[in-house]
């Protein structure tokens, strides 16, 4: 037994040795693994955006686990690892999700890249927000970066050329309003501008908004998206979201912009030679040399181009100082801006001071509240465009503006002095506006919130006009002026419930229900002075005589009450449906039609979510959209539906009242039925995004002043008279073809086509307004006049067959008439002569097209459509390139298919006096001698037929392609700035606005719009000219 034990020891020893070695190795491995895991148990870092600003709320998840955290207010995070994959996933709405291997790192700092168009990006809609992927309406968006690239003074300038179906025109000089048209003109006289909603508050004017305060602008173009705003949404809705504070350490941002601008185009005006030629030819002379007997005299040599005299270098300086920040319970944003702009025309300028404070509170986990307060003071030094620009176009070139002693040449007859008017006339607009908007939101239950808002708007405007003696006729002109004070104020209260709940991860139900009350007040006082005692004192205590017909005061008011609701259903983020209804009651309409109903429905299908599409990995989104809605327009004056009486009517020396307006109890809403069909496509990991929309907008019960028989004692009555339709297509393409660590290329293109048609009018024959004809079956904007076919070369050239075919006269070597031929064959038949006002036309007269074939040209029968002021095609194209902090961008916009009537040319070319100087083309291109082949007729003053009516010779194409903006800049690397310790962001940029324009238009600018008159687009009486602006900018954040 002892031996056995001895034999067993080596075996046991061997086994123990092997087991012990294994055990030791296991302990060593375990120790290494534990130590390794402990070494990697915590990873910290900071997450920033591409602009170097920390991003709070970024999800940081360990891949394959539920372990993770979110970044704090300063973008910092700390995550403790658990066994699993050593990879961190970083995700945040609007940014690309990134996966980063941990390896052996303890600190991982990361810069998130913004997605070109995130499907999870939030889009603002009426009374709420929605993921872009779930939007089933036609919504265009512009962010703050795009807005700031053109250094706009007016918020609307920043969206010019960037959104399909949206046309923006800048009117007037410094401080002038911009005009915006969405999907064509759908009204006659009820206002064509959209509704503006700022942070949920409806406003009538956005000139008091500093573009630097805007975070984004969302344009609701289709009826169903806008219908929740009911009676004000027929022309679309522009939703403006202003900037707000972000959690984190308080930041201070300084923006500074400085620019110079100059006139980039001149209107052709006649020189002294041409004026002398005109004076000779207008009397019937055939001397076209332009020479005069006193050819060495001062006036014969003098050439005065008023445009050179009134233009100047424009200068603009703009600075914004903003503070923002916040904590867990509150956040704030406060920006104060100052703008000082001197126009490119003497006497014009603009100053603006704005302040915007926005505070948001989380009172507890159920209640949030906030307030926004703004104040704006604007000072616009304007000029009377008609008395300056139109006058300069026809002023004699050999008449001085300033005498040799330095005084202004006084005005006499029709020889106005545009320089004196630009520099001395007072045409000032001063206004102060203020806004207060408050909200409280309460979470009543999971998915259910109640929100109430209360907003106030106030605006006080003072208009001051004064015409000193240097600007009135020296013989009988009187120093005159005007002072008008307008006061606008309104309040609105909104109360609504919002519901959003998802059931079983399949069914998402959203709901909205609420009511609102709005009321507006308007007051004015107007003082009009026919004559001042002198121009030393320009206040109204120096008035010698008032105009009692226009001096007075008045006040109006109107109210709007509304109920609204919306419900939406989403199945598996695949099938989408939304329906809404709004019921509005307006005090502006007749007693029989106070209330209007505005329903809408939207349908959407994400085909890309279907199983049969999953294999097509390059398609991120394929969505079909369809919608139908009825929207309204109530933008008419107050009290237009009721009979009005005014005092001041005397009978037997007794003051009494008399009717001044007929009532119309059936006056009601304009209603626009809108259909929209669209498709959205996102490809290649959202690098390419395409949207296509087809729309049809039909407006019924158009509001207009209808002429009535004079026997009633009134000239017209406001009524609902007909319908108009807009049909069109829109295409938007956005892409990011190249994107890597160092270089990014972003490009976009948009295109729109619109066709307009008047479907019905109360009078089937239509009606005229200005130089336009409105008639059934035709488009709005049709210019109405005579068709000019050329100029008769000879007296004998006025010869036609009874069928209206023009004959060819033949002459011998001595210019003696021989005979007529028709198609090369001698003609011996009957001959008709074209007449104007029963007077036979001669050589040098205009060949007007005879519309009815009676060989007598008259206004009733021979005018026709000679042009149209509405464009067919419009859009824009942009590119941006980013490389290692440098960025370069440019923006084109274009417009095709519309015309302009050159009214300024019409006035100076057709004037019968010897004071207005015609255009250079009119003088040098005039018929003088028999046989002349010319564009323009004889200048002989006795030929009144050549000066009659609007005609096609003054219609020009308004087509253009404009390089609207180019910008070059550099943003300093955040790592470099961090070493300084006190600068978070620093960027420099230089840009040029209105670089150049490809157009054949002869005037200052082919972008005319309609200047508030929807029925008369494209009428050019010379407005404030376009300008090229060179800008430098600095942005720094501390």
UniProtKB/Swiss-Prot annotation:
Induction: By ulvan and rhamnose. Belongs to the TonB-dependent receptor family. It holds the Pfam family CarbopepD_reg_2. Residues 131-243 form the TBDR plug domain. It is found in: Cell outer membrane. Residues 1-39 form the signal peptide. A motif (TonB C-terminal box) lies at residues 1021-1038. The keyword Lyase does not apply. Keywords: Cell outer membrane, Membrane, Receptor, Signal, TonB box, Transmembrane, Transmembrane beta strand, Transport. This is TonB-dependent receptor P39. Its main location: membrane. It is a multi-pass membrane protein. Residues 249-1038 form the TBDR beta-barrel domain.
